[in-house]
C-alpha cells in the first residue's frame, strides 16, 4: 500500500538440509509504520511532473507515469534505472511532489478526532490534566503487564481536593519511573488482553469531550467536514467569542495562509492562537473587538498547513500521551510524529505493477495510473494558481480538488462522482475476497496438481487412488540421486517424458534441463548420474555426502503419495493422502467407495483435486499423518467416518446369514480374491499398471475347519470372515466383539410363515414365532477370539463400536484400512457369483392387508371434519351445512388470525399421525408383503441399512403421507384454497397435503404437485444455507485458528494466553475418545489394550496429567461393582485396581498430543455439521405455544454476533418439590400479559351518516364494546371492574384516538390531500421517526434489510426481500455492515464527531419501545400499584385538539364511545382499528415476560438435577416429566424471583447469554453457551463432542466477558495484525497497525501463510536438532 510500509523485518539464518539452493533467510517479525517524507524520497528514482503518458510517436513521455526510469513497459525496452529488460527489472518507484501539504486520507478520521479534542488557544487537550495523566499511567501500566493496577486507577475517580490530586500525581510519577526502569518491556510478549485494554483506554480517552478547555477555559469553534478530507470551522456564537475576548483569548487568522503554507514563524499561518497579556487585551480598541466578532460569525476553512501547526504544538505540549501514537508498545523504535497525518508527496508505484489492459485496438489504462494522472493534473493546476497569484478562494478550491484526487487514489469510495466510485483505489486492491491478502497471499495458485471426474473402483485399497496415465506423465517429483535409487532413475531418464515410468527434466548444481527427445542423448545423461566422486557400490558408505546435487524429475508412479481434496473443504477429512495406482486405459480418477462419506462425494459427475507433494518432509507427513487410513474417526465426535456402503452391505448380509454354505473351491476363491494374503506385507505388492492386484506374496493363509464335513466339506459364510480376521490380526492377540445388528430378531423367520401360510391357529403361530426368537439369535453379532459365532455383518458393524471400529481401536488405522479393503473385494466377488435383484413382487402387499390399508386411509379423510367439529363444539350426529362451516372458520380466523390456523393445522397433523400409524400400518412392511422379509430384496436393503429407508419403502408400497413445507402443512392462498381445484377452507387431509396414494399405483396430479412443492423446499434450503454456514465457519476458523495444545497440556492462543488448563477439561483427544468409557469392551479385549501400552504410559504420560479424571474413575468403579463375581474372575478383575490400571493405560494413550490444532478442529466440527441444518429458523417447543430460534440463525446469534437482544429469549424454572401443576398455573396467570382484546366479548359499530353536532354537519360512529364478566378472567388474577374501566378510559381511548388520527393522515396522503393538522398528538412522533428511518434504510440498500418494518411489507414482499438477501454472497454479508464506519476508517471511527457522541447509541443499548401498560414493569402481583398507575395515567390524560370522541360511557360489562367525523373525511374501518388497538393496551403486564406456559422438567431447555443441585444425580425421564416447570417467553429474572416460595430458583435458566452473564457471572455464561450450541445441534440429531463446545465457550469468555467471533470480537483483540487484515476490512486494520506501530511476531497461522512459512502447530511446533559427534 502506498505510504504504508513494513520495517524492521527480523531475519534468522539457517542451512537447508533438503535443497542445495534452499532459503538462507527467514522472516521472524514484521513491524508496521507509515512512510515518512524521507522514506518516499529514498525510494524514488524520478520526480513525476507531467500528466502526459506518451508522446506523438507512442513512446513513454519523460517525467510521465510511463517514464522508463520507473521500469520498461514493453518486453523489448530496457530500464533506464537498472538497464534490465522487463522480465528481470524489479521496477522502480517515483514520486509526485505536492505544491501544498494535504491530509493523509487513511488517517483523516483520527486527525479530525484529535482536532476536536485539542484546544486552539493553549494547544493542550481540552480534557482535564488529571484525565490525560491517568490515561498515560494506565497505558504504561498495561504495557508493563499490570492490568489490575490500571483497572484500579480507572475506578479511582479523582475528587476535587488537593490531596487527592497530589496522590494521583504521585501514583503517576511512581508508575512512570518504574516503567522507565523496566528494561524487559521491549522484549515482553504482548497478549490479546493487554492489546484490548490499551485500545479501550485510547478509545475512552478520545471519547472525552468538552465545550471549553479545562486549562485556559477557552471556548473552541466547532468543526465540520464539508467533504471527506477537508475541515471547516463553524461560526461561533457571539457569547462564546465574547467570553474568549474577556479571558484574553483570541483566534488569529493568518492572511498568509495560501502564500506561505509551510511557514513556521509566528507571523505565518501557525500563529493561529496566542494567549496575550490580560492588561494589554483590555486596552484593545472596540473596533478590533467588533472585527473579531464579525470574523467568527461566518464559516471558514481550516487548511492543512494550519492544522499541521496545531498538531505540532499539541505534540510538544502533550508529548507523553502523543508518543503512544506511532509506537503503542513504547519499544524504542524510530518514532513517527504528527507528520504522518499529512502528505507532501505521493509515491508512484513502478510501471510493471499497473500495466495497461489491451483488448483489440483499444488500450485501457490501469485504475491506479488514471488516479495518479488525476493527482498530477490537480497538483499542476494548484501550482499554476499560486504562480499566477489568483484569489485566495480560488486557490483553496483547487487545494480541495487536489485533496479529493488523492482521496480517490487511496479509496475510491470517498469519491463524489459515481464513475470514480466504481474504479479501484488502493484500499479496494486490499479488501474482500479478491483483494491482495486473501487472493494473493492467503490463497495462491498451485502447481503439481490435477483435477478430474471421479469414478468408483471397489478393487483398489481404500487408501489408494487410481491415476490415469495422462496425469502420471505430466506430474513429476524431484528425486535426489543416491546410490540406492540410481538404477531406477537411470531407467526413468532413458524412458523419457513420453514413456511411463519416465522423467521430464534433469538438474544439477548449475542448471535444469529438459530431457532431449532422442533416446541416445538421454542414455548419455543417464550414464553420468553417478559417474564422478562419491559413487560407490557398498551400501551406506560414501565418500561425499553431497553428490553434486543431481536431481531427476521423474514421473508419478505406483506407491507415491498424493493429497486428494474435494471442495467444499469443510473439515479435516476433506483433504487426505492416498497412495497412487497408475491405471492404464483410464481417463478419470478412481476412488474407493469407503471414501465417499469422508469427502461427501458421489459418482454423478463430482470432480476432485489431486496435489503431488514435492519434498520429503511433505511426503513423510502424508504417509504417516494425513494418510486416508488415519482419518477413520470423525473429528467432530470421534465416530467412524469410513465404511462400506450399498451393495457391499447387501453382499455382507447374504454372505454371513446362517444358511449360506460354500464348498472348498468357492471358499478358497473368495479368500484369495479378497487379497488378504498381501495385507500382512508392509510394502506395495503387485505389478505396476495393472487394474487388479496380482498376489506376489508367499505368505501362507491359515484356513479354518469346515462347519460340515459330510457328505462334502462345507464352510459357512461366517467362516470366511473368521479366516480374514485371523489373517488381519496375525501376530497379535485375537479380539472379541459384541454388537447388535440393524436386522430385527424375526427377520429370517420366513420359513415359519411358509409352513402353514393359511393356518388359523394363532396360538400355534405364536409358539413358532417365540421359538424362532429364541433359536435364531441373528440380531446380535458376536465374534469371540476372532471366531464369528452368530449374527450378520450389516451397516451397524461399520458404525460406532462395530466390528471395524473395534479393529481400528485395538490394532490401529492400517489394520482397519486393510480390513475394509479386504471386505470390499470379498463382498464384491461374492455378489458377482450370488447375484442380487429387485422386482415388482418385492413391493406388492397381500390382498387382505391392502384392503385394510385402503380402509384405514379412507378413515383418515374424515379427520379434518372431526377436528373442526371438536374445535367448534359441534356434535358428531348434528348435520351442518358446508357453507356454515366455512363461515365459522372465517370468523375464527378473523378473530384469532394466524395462530388459529396454526393450531388447527397442528391438531389435524396429530390426528393424521395417530390414524396413519396404528393398526395394519405398523406391520404392513414386515408382515403384509407378498414376499417375506427374509426373501424380500427391498426389505433387505432398507432394514440392513444398505440403501434407502423404511420411509422410501412406505412411499412405494403404502402411501406418501403428509407433505411438510417449513414444518407446516401446505399453505393456503388468499382465497382459502391450497390449489384451485379444492374448495375454499377445505380442511380435508388431502387438500392440506396428505397423500394417500403410493408410487406403486401412481399419484394424482394434485398429490404430484404437493410432492414437488416439498421437494423444491429442499433444493432452496441447500442453495441458501451454503453461504450462511460458510461464513459462520470462516468466522470460527479465523478466531480459533491459533489455539493449540502445548507441551504443558494447556491450550493457548498465539500470544501465550491460556484458554484452557486441560484440553476439553480432561485432555483427551476427540479422535481417541470413543472407547474410553466402554469398560466392557476394554475388559474383554484387555490383552490387546495392555499390549499397546508401555509401563511408562501407565505411570503417567506427563508430569502435568498424572491421574484419571474423577468422572472416569467413578464410572470404572461402578462398572466393577455391578459385575457378577464369576465375570470378575473370568476377566481377572477381582479388584478395582486391575480395571483402573487398564482404564488408566487407555486414558493416557488417548491424550491429545502437543501441537494438536484443537482450535481449527473445534471450528470445523461446529461449522461442518451446520451445513446439514435446514433454514427452519423457528421450531415449535413443546406443544407449539412458543417459538425458539434454531438452526444457523441461532448459531449466528450465539457465536458470530453475541447478540444482547436475541430474537426469542426464554426462561425456564422447575417448581419446588411437592408443588403441583395447579401452583404452576397460578404463577402463569399472574405472569400472563392480559390485553383489552382478551376481555372483549363482542364489538358493535353503528354509523349515523348525517347529523348535526354543535352546529356542524357530521357523521357519528358509535362503538359499543361488550366485555366478559370477571368470572371469565384467568383464575388467579386480581383484575376488577375498576381496573378495566380506568384502563379503557385512560389508556385505550387515548391510543384509539391516536390510531384514528394516524390512519386518517395516511388516507389523506393516499387521496392526495395535504391538509395541515393542527398540533402534534401523542404517539405521532414515532411515525415521524419511522419515516426518517425508512429514508435511511432506502439509502443503505446493502444492509440486509435490517431496518425495514415487517408490518409494512406484505407476505410476498417479505419473501422477495428475504430471497434478495439470501442471494448475497456471504462475503458481502460481512464486510458492508451498517454499524461499521466509512470505508476509510481511522483507528477509532465511531467516535469521530463530538456532536454525534451525545446522540449516538449502539443498537444493543437502544431500549425497545414498550407497549402502553397501566402498571409498573416489575410489578407482577397485587392490584394496588395497578390502580395507582392507572390513576396517574388518568391525571395525565389531556384532550388533544384533534380528538374526535364526543361521548364516553362505561358501566358494568359495557363500554360505549362516539366519534365525530366531518362529511368530507374518508371512510375508515373503525372496528378494525379498535381491535388492533385493543391488542396493544395491557390491563396486566409482567415486565418483559411476553408469555408464560406450564411445561415439565423433561423439556430439554429446563435444568433439573433433583432437590440438591450439588449432587447432580441422574434422574429418569419419567420422573422429570412428572415434575412441573415454567416456560416463559422473555427474560425478567426479578419477576420470577418474586415466586421463590413456589419456584426452585436455583435452577432458573435463560437462553439469553448476556443476561446470564450480567446476573450470574461468567461461568454461568460459559455453561449457557455450551448448552445452547448443544441444544441447536441436538434438535437436528447432530452429535458434536462436548470438548469442542468447551473450547469455544472458554475462548468466548476468556476475557471475563462475552465476546463475539467477528471482527469486533476476538479478531479485533488479536495481537497479530496479519490475522486481523486477512479476515475482513483489511484497510482498517492495516491503518491501525501502522498508526500504533504494531509488530507481528508471526505466531498465528494467517501471518505465517502470508509470508510463506509453515504454521507453528502440529509438526511445525518444534525444531529437530541433529546430534553431531566431534
UniProtKB/Swiss-Prot annotation:
Keywords: DNA-directed RNA polymerase, Magnesium, Metal-binding, Nucleotidyltransferase, Nucleus, Ribosome biogenesis, Transcription, Transferase, Zinc
Binding positions for Zn(2+) 1 per the UniProt entry: 79, 82, 89, 92
Pfam families: RNA_pol_Rpb1_1 (PF04997), RNA_pol_Rpb1_2 (PF00623), RNA_pol_Rpb1_3 (PF04983), RNA_pol_Rpb1_4 (PF05000), RNA_pol_Rpb1_5 (PF04998)
Signal sequence bounds: none
Organism (species): Arabidopsis thaliana
Lineage of the organism: Eukaryota, Viridiplantae, Streptophyta, Embryophyta, Tracheophyta
Entry-linked InterPro entries: DNA-dir_RNA_pol1_lsu_C, DNA-dir_RNA_pol1_lsu_N, DNA-dir_RpoC_beta_prime, RNA_pol_asu, RNA_pol_N, RNA_pol_Rpb1_1, RNA_pol_Rpb1_3, RNA_pol_Rpb1_3_sf
Enzyme Commission code: 2.7.7.6
Ranges where the record places region Bridging helix: 1005-1017
GO biological process assignments: DNA-templated transcription; ribosome biogenesis
Function summary: DNA-dependent RNA polymerase catalyzes the transcription of DNA into RNA using the four ribonucleoside triphosphates as substrates. Largest and catalytic core component of RNA polymerase I which synthesizes ribosomal RNA precursors. Forms the polymerase active center together with the second largest subunit. A single stranded DNA template strand of the promoter is positioned within the central active site cleft of Pol I.
Protein's recorded name: DNA-directed RNA polymerase I subunit 1
CDD domains cross-referenced by the UniProt entry: RNAP_I_Rpa1_C (cd02735), RNAP_I_RPA1_N (cd01435)
Amino acid at each position: 500500500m502506498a505510504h504504508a510500509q513494513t520495517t524492521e523485518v527480523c531475519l534468522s539464518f539457517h542451512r537447508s538440509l533438503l535443497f542445495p539452493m534452499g532459503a538462507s533467510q527467514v522472516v521472524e517479525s514484521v513491524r508496521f509504520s507509515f512512510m515518512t517524507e524521507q522514506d518516499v524520497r529514498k525510494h524514488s528514482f524520478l520526480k513525476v511532473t507531467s500528466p502526459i503518458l506518451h508522446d506523438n510517436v507512442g513512446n513513454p513521455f519523460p517525467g510521465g507515469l510511463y517514464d522508463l526510469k520507473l521500469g520498461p513497459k514493453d518486453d523489448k525496452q530496457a530500464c533506464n534505472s537498472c538497464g534490465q529488460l522487463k522480465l528481470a527489472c524489479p521496477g522502480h518507484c517515483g514520486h509526485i511532489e505536492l505544491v501544498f501539504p494535504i491530509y493523509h486520507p487513511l488517517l483523516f478520521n483520527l486527525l479530525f478526532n484529535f482536532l476536536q479534542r485539542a484546544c486552539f488557544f493553549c494547544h493542550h487537550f481540552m480534557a482535564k490534566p488529571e484525565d490525560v495523566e491517568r490515561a498515560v499511567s494506565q497505558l504504561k501500566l498495561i504495557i508493563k503487564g499490570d492490568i489490575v493496577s490500571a483497572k484500579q486507577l480507572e475506578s479511582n475517580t479523582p475528587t476535587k481536593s488537593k490531596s487527592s490530586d497530589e496522590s494521583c500525581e504521585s501514583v503517576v510519577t511512581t508508575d512512570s519511573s518504574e516503567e522507565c526502569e523496566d528494561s524487559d518491556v521491549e522484549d515482553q510478549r504482548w497478549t490479546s488482553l493487554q492489546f484490548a485494554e490499551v485500545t479501550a483506554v485510547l478509545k475512552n480517552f478520545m471519547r472525552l469531550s468538552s465545550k471549553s478547555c479545562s486549562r485556559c477555559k477557552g471556548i473552541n469553534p466547532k468543526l465540520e467536514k464539508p467533504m471527506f478530507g477537508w475541515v471547516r470551522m463553524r461560526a461561533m456564537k457571539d457569547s462564546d467569542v465574547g467570553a474568549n475576548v474577556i479571558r484574553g483569548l483570541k483566534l488569529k487568522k493568518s492572511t498568509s495562509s495560501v502564500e506561505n503554507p509551510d511557514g513556521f514563524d509566528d507571523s505565518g499561518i501557525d500563529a493561529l492562537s496566542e494567549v496575550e497579556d490580560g492588561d494589554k487585551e483590555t486596552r484593545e480598541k472596540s473596533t478590533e473587538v467588533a472585527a473579531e466578532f464579525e470574523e467568527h460569525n461566518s464559516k471558514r476553512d481550516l487548511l492543512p498547513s494550519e492544522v499541521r501547526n496545531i498538531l505540532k504544538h499539541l505534540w510538544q505540549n502533550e508529548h507523553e500521551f502523543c508518543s503512544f501514537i506511532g509506537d503503542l508498545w513504547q519499544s524504542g523504535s524510530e518514532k513517527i510524529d504528527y507528520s504522518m497525518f499529512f502528505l507532501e508527496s505521493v509515491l508512484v508505484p513502478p510501471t510493471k505493477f499497473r500495466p495497461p489492459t489491451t483488448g483489440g485496438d483499444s488500450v485501457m489504462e490501469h485504475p491506479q495510473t488514471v488516479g495518479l494522472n488525476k493527482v498530477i493534473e490537480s497538483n499542476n493546476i494548484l501550482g499554476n494558481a499560486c504562480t499566477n497569484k489568483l484569489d485566495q478562494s480560488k486557490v483553496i478550491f483547487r487545494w480541495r480538488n487536489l485533496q479529493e484526487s488523492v482521496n480517490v487514489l487511496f479509496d475510491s469510495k470517498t469519491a463524489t462522482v459515481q464513475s470514480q466510485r466504481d474504479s479501484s483505489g488502493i484500499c479496494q486492491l486490499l479488501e474482500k475476497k479478491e483483494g491482495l491478502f486473501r487472493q494473493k497471499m492467503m490463497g495462491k495458485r498451485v502447481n503439481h496438481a490435477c483435477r478430474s471426474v471421479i469414478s468408483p473402483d471397489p478393487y483398489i485399497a481404500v487408501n489408494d487412488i487410481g491415476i490415469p496415465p495422462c496425469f502420471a506423465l505430466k506430474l513429476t517429483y524431484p528425486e535426489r540421486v543416491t546410490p540406492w535409487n540410481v538404477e531406477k532413475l537411470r531407467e526413468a531418464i532413458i524412458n523419457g517424458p513420453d514413456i511411463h515410468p519416465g522423467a521430464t527434466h534433469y538438474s544439477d548444481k548449475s542448471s535444469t534441463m529438459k530431457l532431449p527427445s532422442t533416446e541416445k542423448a538421454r542414455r548419455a545423461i543417464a550414464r553420468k548420474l553417478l559417474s564422478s566422486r562419491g559413487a560407490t557400490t557398498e551400501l551406506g558408505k560414501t565418500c561425499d555426502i553431497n553428490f553434486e546435487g543431481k536431481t531427476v524429475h521423474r514421473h508419478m508412479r505406483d506407491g507415491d503419495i498424493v493429497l486428494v481434496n474435494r471442495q467444499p473443504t469443510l473439515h479435516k477429512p476433506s483433504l487426505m493422502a492416498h497412495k497412487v495406482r497408475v491405471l492404464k486405459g483410464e481417463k478419470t480418477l478412481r476412488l474407493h467407495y469407503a471414501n465417499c462419506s469422508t469427502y461427501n462425494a458421489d459418482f454423478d459427475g463430482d470432480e476432485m483435486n489431486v496435489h503431488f507433494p514435492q519434498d520429503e518432509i511433505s511426503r513423510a507427513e502424508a504417509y504417516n499423518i494425513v494418510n486416508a487410513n488415519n482419518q477413520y474417526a470423525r473429528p467432530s465426535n470421534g465416530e467412524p467416518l469410513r465404511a462400506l456402503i450399498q451393495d457391499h452391505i447387501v453382499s455382507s448380509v447374504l454372505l454371513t446369514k446362517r444358511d449360506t454354505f460354500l464348498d472348498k473351491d468357492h471358499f478358497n476363491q473368495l479368500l484369495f480374491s479378497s487379497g488378504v494374503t498381501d495385507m500382512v506385507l508392509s510394502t506395495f505388492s503387485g505389478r505396476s499398471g495393472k487394474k487388479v492386484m496380482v498376489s506376489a506374496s508367499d505368505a501362507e493363509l491359515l484356513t479354518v475347519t469346515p462347519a460340515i464335513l459330510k457328505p462334502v466339506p462345507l464352510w459357512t459364510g461366517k467362516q470366511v470372515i473368521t479366516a480374514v480376521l485371523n489373517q488381519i490380526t496375525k501376530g497379535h492377540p485375537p479380539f472379541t466383539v459384541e454388537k447388535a445388528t440393524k436386522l430385527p430378531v424375526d427377520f429370517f423367520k420366513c420359513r415359519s410363515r411358509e409352513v402353514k401360510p393359511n393356518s388359523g391357529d394363532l396360538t400355534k403361530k405364536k409358539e413358532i414365532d417365540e421359538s424362532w426368537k429364541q433359536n435364531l439369535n441373528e440380531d446380535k453379532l458376536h465374534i469371540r477370539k476372532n471366531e464369528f459365532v452368530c449374527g450378520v455383518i450389516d451397516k451397524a458393524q461399520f458404525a460406532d463400536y462395530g466390528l471395524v471400529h473395534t479393529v481400528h481401536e485395538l490394532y490401529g488405522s492400517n489394520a482397519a484400512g486393510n480390513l475394509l479393503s479386504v471386505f470390499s473385494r470379498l463382498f464384491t466377488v461374492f455378489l458377482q457369483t450370488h447375484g442380487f435383484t429387485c422386482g415388482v413382487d418385492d413391493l406388492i402387499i397381500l390382498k387382505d392387508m391392502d384392503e385394510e390399508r385402503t380402509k384405514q386411509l379412507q378413515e383418515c379423510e374424515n379427520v379434518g371434519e372431526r377436528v373442526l367439529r371438536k374445535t367448534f363444539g359441534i356434535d358428531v350426529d348434528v348435520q351442518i351445512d358446508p357453507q356454515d362451516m366455512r363461515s365459522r372458520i372465517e370468523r375464527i380466523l378473523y378473530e384469532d388470525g394466524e395462530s388459529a390456523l396454526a393450531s388447527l393445522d397442528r391438531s389435524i397433523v396429530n390426528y393424521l399421525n395417530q390414524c396413519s400409524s396404528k393398526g395394519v400400518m405398523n406391520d404392513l412392511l414386515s408382515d403384509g408383503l407378498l414376499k417375506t422379509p427374509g426373501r424380500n430384496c427391498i426389505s433387505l436393503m432398507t432394514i440392513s441399512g444398505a440403501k434407502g429407508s423404511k420411509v422410501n419403502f412406505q412411499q412405494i408400497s403404502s402411501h406418501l403421507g403428509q407433505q411438510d413445507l417449513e414444518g407446516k402443512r401446505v399453505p393456503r392462498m388468499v382465497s382459502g384454497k391450497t390449489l384451485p381445484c379444492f374448495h375454499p377452507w377445505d380442511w380435508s387431509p388431502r387438500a392440506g397435503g396428505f397423500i394417500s396414494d403410493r408410487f406403486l399405483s401412481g399419484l394424482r396430479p394434485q398429490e404430484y404437485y404437493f410432492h414437488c412443492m416439498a421437494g423444491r423446499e429442499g433444493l432452496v434450503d441447500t442453495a441458501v444455507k451454503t453461504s450462511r454456514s460458510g461464513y459462520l465457519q470462516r468466522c470460527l476458523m479465523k478466531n480459533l485458528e491459533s489455539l493449540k495444545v502445548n507441551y504443558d497440556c494447556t491450550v493457548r492462543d498465539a500470544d501465550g494466553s491460556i484458554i484452557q488448563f486441560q484440553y476439553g477439561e480432561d485432555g483427551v483427544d476427540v479422535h481417541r475418545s470413543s472407547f474410553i468409557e466402554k469398560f466392557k469392551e476394554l475388559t474383554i479385549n484387555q490383552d490387546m489394550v495392555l499390549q499397546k501400552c508401555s509401563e511408562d504410559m501407565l505411570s503417567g504420560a506427563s508430569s502435568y496429567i498424572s491421574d484419571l479424571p474423577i468422572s472416569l474413575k467413578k464410572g470404572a468403579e461402578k462398572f466393577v461393582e455391578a459385575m457378577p463375581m464369576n465375570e470378575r474372575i473370568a476377566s481377572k478383575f477381582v479388584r478395582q485396581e486391575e480395571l483402573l490400571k487398564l482404564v488408566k493405560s487407555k486414558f493416557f494413550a488417548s491424550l491429545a498430543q502437543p501441537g494438536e490444532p484443537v482450535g481449527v478442529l473445534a471450528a470445523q466440527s461446529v461449522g461442518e455439521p451446520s451445513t446439514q441444518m435446514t433454514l427452519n429458523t423457528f421450531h415449535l417447543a413443546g406443544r407449539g405455544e412458543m417459538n425458539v430460534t434454531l438452526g444457523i440463525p441461532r448459531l449466528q446469534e450465539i457465536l458470530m454476533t453475541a447478540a444482547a437482544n436475541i430474537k426469542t429469549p426464554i426462561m425456564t424454572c422447575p417448581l419446588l418439590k411437592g408443588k403441583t401443576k395447579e401452583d404452576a398455573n397460578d404463577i402463569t396467570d399472574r405472569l400472563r400479559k392480559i390485553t383489552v382484546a382478551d376481555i372483549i366479548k363482542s364489538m358493535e359499530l353503528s354509523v349515523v351518516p348525517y347529523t348535526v353536532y354543535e352546529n356542524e354537519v357530521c357523521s357519528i360512529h358509535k362503538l359499543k364494546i361488550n366485555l366478559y364478566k370477571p368470572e371469565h378472567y384467568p383464575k388467579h388474577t386480581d383484575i376488577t371492574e375498576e381496573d378495566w374501566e380506568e384502563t379503557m378510559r385512560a389508556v385505550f381511548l387515548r391510543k384509539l384516538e391516536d390510531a384514528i388520527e394516524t390512519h386518517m393522515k395516511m388516507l389523506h396522503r393516499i387521496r392526495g390531500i395535504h391538509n395541515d393538522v393542527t398540533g402534534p398528538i401523542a404517539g405521532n412522533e414515532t411515525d415521524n421517526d419511522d419515516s426518517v428511518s425508512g429514508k435511511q434504510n432506502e439509502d443503505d440498500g446493502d444492509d440486509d434489510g435490517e431496518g425495514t418494518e415487517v408490518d409494512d411489507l406484505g407476505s410476498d414482499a417479505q419473501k422477495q426481500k428475504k430471497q434478495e438477501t439470501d442471494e448475497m454472497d456471504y462475503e458481502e454479508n460481512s464486510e458492508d455492515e451498517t454499524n461499521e464506519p466509512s470505508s476509510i476508517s481511522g483507528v477509532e471511527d465511531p467516535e469521530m464527531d463530538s456532536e454525534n457522541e451525545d446522540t449516538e447509541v449502539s443498537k444493543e443499548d437502544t431500549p425497545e419501545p414498550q407497549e402502553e401498560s397501566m402498571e409498573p414493569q416489575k410489578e407482577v402481583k397485587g392490584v394496588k400499584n395497578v390502580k395507582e398507575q392507572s390513576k396517574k395515567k388518568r391525571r395525565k390524560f389531556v384532550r388533544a385538539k384533534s380528538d374526535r370522541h364526543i361521548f364516553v360511557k362505561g358501566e358494568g360489562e359495557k363500554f360505549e364511545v362516539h366519534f365525530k367525523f366531518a362529511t368530507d373525511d374518508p371512510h375508515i374501518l373503525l372496528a378494525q382499528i379498535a381491535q388492533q388497538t385493543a391488542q396493544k393496551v395491557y390491563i396486566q403486564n409482567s415486565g418483559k415476560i411476553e408469555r408464560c406456559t406450564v411445561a415439565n422438567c423433561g423439556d430439554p431447555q429446563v435444568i433439573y438435577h433433583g432437590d440438591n443441585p450439588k449432587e447432580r444425580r441422574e434422574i429418569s425421564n419419567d420422573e422429570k416429566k412428572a415434575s412441573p416447570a415454567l416456560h416463559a417467553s422473555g427474560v425478567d429474572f426479578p419477576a420470577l424471583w418474586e415466586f421463590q416460595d413456589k419456584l426452585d430458583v436455583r435452577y432458573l435458566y435463560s437462553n439469553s447469554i448476556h443476561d446470564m452473564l450480567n446476573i450470574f457471572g461468567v461461568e454461568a455464561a460459559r455453561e449457557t453457551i455450551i448448552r445452547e450450541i448443544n441444544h441447536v445441534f441436538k434438535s437436528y440429531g447432530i452429535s458434536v463432542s462436548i470438548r469442542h463446545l468447551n473450547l469455544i465457550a472458554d475462548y468466548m469468555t476468556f476475557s471475563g466477558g462475552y465476546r463475539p467471533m467477528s471482527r469486533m470480537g476476538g479478531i479485533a483483540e488479536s495481537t497479530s495484525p496479519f490475522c486481523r487484515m486477512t479476515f475482513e476490512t483489511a484497510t482498517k486494520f492495516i491503518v491501525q497497525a501502522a498508526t500504533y506501530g504494531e509488530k507481528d511476531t508471526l505466531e498465528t497461522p494467517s501471518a505465517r501463510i502470508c509470508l510463506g512459512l509453515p504454521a507453528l502447530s502440529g509438526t511445525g511446533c518444534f525444531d529437530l536438532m541433529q546430534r553431531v559427534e566431534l
